UniProtKB/Swiss-Prot annotation:
Matching Pfam families: tRNA_m1G_MT (PF01746)
Protein location: Cytoplasm
UniProt xrefs under NCBIfam families: PRK00026.1, trmD
Record GO cellular component, one term: cytosol
Entry protein name: tRNA (guanine-N(1)-)-methyltransferase
InterPro entries: Alpha/beta_knot_MTases, tRNA_m1G_MeTrfase_C_sf, tRNA_m1G_MeTrfase_TrmD, tRNA_m1G_MTases_N, tRNA_MeTrfase_TRMD/TRM10
Binding site for S-adenosyl-L-methionine: 112, 132-137
Amino acid sequence: MRIDIITVLPEMLEGFFNCSIMSRAQKKGIAEIHIHNLRDYAYDRYRKVDDYPFGGFAGMVMKIEPIDRCISALKAEREYDEIIFTSPDGEQFNQPMANSLSLAKNLIILCGHFKGIDYRIREHFITKEISIGDYVLTGGELAAAVIADAVVRIIPGVISDEQSALSDSFQDNLLAAPVYTRPAEYKGWQVPDVLLSGHEAKIKEWELQQSLERTQRLRPDLLK
């Protein structure tokens, strides 16, 4: 998989993609992450990528020309399954969406900034708008990192223990069961006996029961 991220703050993302699972996925050759500084596609010597909105509205708007130039340059080199814009207006990001996007070969993620982007970009280039929650961030960079991480980590081969990824919260619209490690007893707090029994069927039954109970208590909306 290849993910191209377009941003006005590349330094905000570079460290993230050089750590942990994202770094491992790239070293294994399973994923490629390319970060593009939108200012490199600006027309003027000041590398200006924003301007005042028509109509006298407040704030600044990301200009159409640099975004067009960047996306067009990328599309000239390869086909993309989705061109994603991180936006509070978008569809709420969730695990099923991450699962679906993990099957893609090439993705572009455009990070929103300022008051937004010239709407013509959304009309003529963007194929999918994604929100990571009903709150406002300084820019779309954090959202892009969240999306990329959730998508890449479930590609086969990225995580050595694939069963661990498949049992994460939300994979079956259920929260994960509690997990424990050594010591089995600490300050009188005991690990559930069933987990120490070695009885695989009973452990699986306990895991499902715990997942259902936790989901009903903490996220009943997932069971609807």
